[in-house]
Amino acid sequence: MSRARTLARKRAVQALYMWEMTKVDLSDIDQQFVLEHDMSKVDLKYFQELLHKIPAHIDVIDDHIHTYLDRPFSEIDPVERAIMRLGVYELQYRPDVPYRVVINEAVEIAKVFGAEDGYKYVNSILDATAKKLRAAELKARKSS
């Protein structure tokens, strides 16, 4: 897995959190991150895709997440919401990224930025979502 992509995901989670908390324009957040953070080792194109396309597809993404929640969406930690949204986006719109990579990356980001055991919840939601969105990929993996 690409270190530059991992860094893009981490920065995207931070930027999506900022967007949700402040509702600042995405272009301004994008510009701020490029100017104020070390983005030299980040896959900038992927960061920008995540930052701009996740909000563009937020209703579809959130519908997938809502399907598996055991509590109101508003009670989910905002950082963990951002991580779940990133994971669901990749599961839905980036079939080139293997589902295991999506889940592993999200879990690792949740361990760094989320609440103490938040990564377990992120894992369970993304695992359930992957079973729905990537059923053929999971089936192929089991039969090989």
Predicted feature residues:
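N-terminal interaction/assembly modules
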Residues: 1-144
